[in-house]
Amino acid sequence: MKRPLDFKLYVITGENYHPGRGMLEVMEAALRGGADIVQLRDKMSPKRELIEKAKRLKELTAKYGVPLIVNDHPDVALAADADGVHLGQDDLPIEAARELLGPGRIIGISTHRIEQARAAERAGADYIGVGPVYPTGTKPGRKAVTTAYVAQAAAEIGIPFVAIGGITETNAEEVLWAGARRLCAVSAIVGHDNPESVCRNLLGKINAWHLGEQVALAESVSLSVPVSLSAPMPAPGDVREIDVVVNGRSERTQAATLLELAAEYKLEGRSVIAELDGAVVPRQLWGETPLQGGGSVEFVHFVGGG
């Protein structure tokens, strides 16, 4: 049975970024630093050599209890007993890969616009890559999707997504601010003299956002009076009206939760991010986030393909 997919820092191999140092040496440093999912990406090696690399890397990742994903090749993933495969848009369809791999292995796919993300989710992908967020040498010539697409994915996609492409210690917080909660890096980690240190730093930033999001969400519902996420909702049949500010305009509403307010504005099924008093509220928590009088809500709706 496939275990639930839960990761924060995704590291991809890139042997061209560390000449003179072996792949296993570099990847073990990343694992010591907290990488919790690893991908073998090698576009040049013959298939037999790729299988041997995957087997050696699988031994290493297994020691740390971390999944190994193989880029592009479901057959290599099977031969090396890897945990899954990562596909590109021009690779084998997700459904065909699932037929080969069975239900117990992970299937991820790169996406570059929201339509591809929606299609991947419908097809049964376990996670998607969102990028490249910034220009990157790993994908030369590929137009950056910017953090706007990250925000769209955060607003709409229900399966895990990982932001990738040009992400560094310097810009990671910008990507997290846009809504990513999982980051992927190649050159910034494996091309660094100290991959372990970079991983610890990036993971620290991710963890800070996870913790800060929980605290901010609890504080964001403290509007006119202190309340918590467990604050009682109005009893069924009770009708109350409150004044809130929605996208800069004062409005009177009977909505008890952020989800009900979104429904009043007919935002169901649309690519929307919601902020309550300046804090982004994850979409899955809208239904349990109570509204109080005097609050300020911002709905940001994304149009187009990212």
Predicted region positions:
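Conserved N-terminal beta1-alpha1 strand-loop-helix module at the mouth
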Residues: M1-D91, E99-D126, R142-V145, I159, ...
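Active-site phosphate/pyrophosphate- and oxyanion-stabilizing loops and adjacent acidic/basic residues
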Residues: K55, E95, A151, R200, ...
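Glycine-rich beta-strand-to-loop/alpha-helix junction loops that act as flexible
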Residues: V130, A163-I167, A185-S187, G305-G306
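Substrate-recognition "cap/lid" segment bordering the active-site pocket of phosphatases
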Residues: K139-A151
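Catalytic-face loop-and-helix region of soluble metabolic enzyme cores
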Residues: Q152, G158-F161, G166
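C-terminal binding/interaction regions
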Residues: A178, R182
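Compositionally biased, low-complexity segments
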Residues: A216-S230
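Ubiquitin-like/PB1-type beta-grasp interaction modules and other compact soluble beta-rich domains
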Residues: P226-G305
